[in-house]
């Protein structure tokens, strides 16, 4: 994170829970890691908070720091073109009335192109949807994990029945 107060809170929370975590202050467009030095780059509900130029810079940095075989995973809002018109409208409405200046622009981007423009091969892109783990049985969760992404009215909505969306790519080249 770039915000010292967020890092201080995270550190205090981790210590209170007895969890050893090392936090680093850094910007997503200049990660403090060597080339090909990490196995996983993960972001959660982060990209829609950035202007487009920083989103693209983040993908280039993720590609740079990932080892061969490493994985980029982004848990995010689903793209506009994956949803029914009403559901896309609902999220656009939420963007405007929730004071989210970059939310809609992000959702209008091509997620596969974000990956391929950063260096990932087109066939390395993946996307997945998963139900909220605490809402469904382990059997339903396992079944969801074994099928292709399915978009519905709960995808990306903060509700008890939320369907989480993730996308990314594996660096094989």
Residue ranges: model-predicted function:
Residues 29-41:
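A short acidic, Gly/Pro-enriched loop at the edge of an enzyme's catalytic core
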Residues 56-68:
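A short glycine-rich, Lys/Arg-flanked "PGG" loop and its adjoining helix->strand segment in the class I
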Residues 73-137:
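C-terminal alpha-helical "lid/dimerization" subdomain adjacent to the S-adenosyl-L-methionine
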């Amino acid at each position: 994170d770039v915000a010292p107060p967020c890092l201080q809170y995270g550190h205090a929370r981790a210590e209170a829970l007895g969890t050893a975590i090392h936090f680093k202050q850094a910007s997503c467009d200049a990660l403090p890691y060597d080339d090909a030095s990490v196995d996983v780059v993960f972001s959660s509900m982060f990209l829609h908070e950035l202007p487009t130029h920083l989103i693209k810079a983040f993908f280039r940095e993720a590609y740079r720091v990932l080892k061969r075989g490493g994985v980029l995973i982004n848990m995010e809002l689903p793209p506009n073109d994956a949803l029914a018109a009403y559901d896309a409208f609902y999220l656009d409405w939420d963007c405007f009335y929730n004071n989210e200046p970059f939310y809609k622009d992000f959702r209008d981007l091509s997620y596969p192109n974000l990956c391929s423009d950063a260096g990932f091969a087109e066939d390395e892109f993946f996307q997945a949807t998963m139900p909220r783990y605490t809402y469904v049985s382990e059997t339903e969760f396992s079944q969801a994990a074994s099928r292709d992404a399915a978009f519905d009215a709960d995808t990306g909505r903060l509700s008890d029945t939320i369907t989480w969306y993730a996308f990314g790519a594996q660096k094989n080249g």
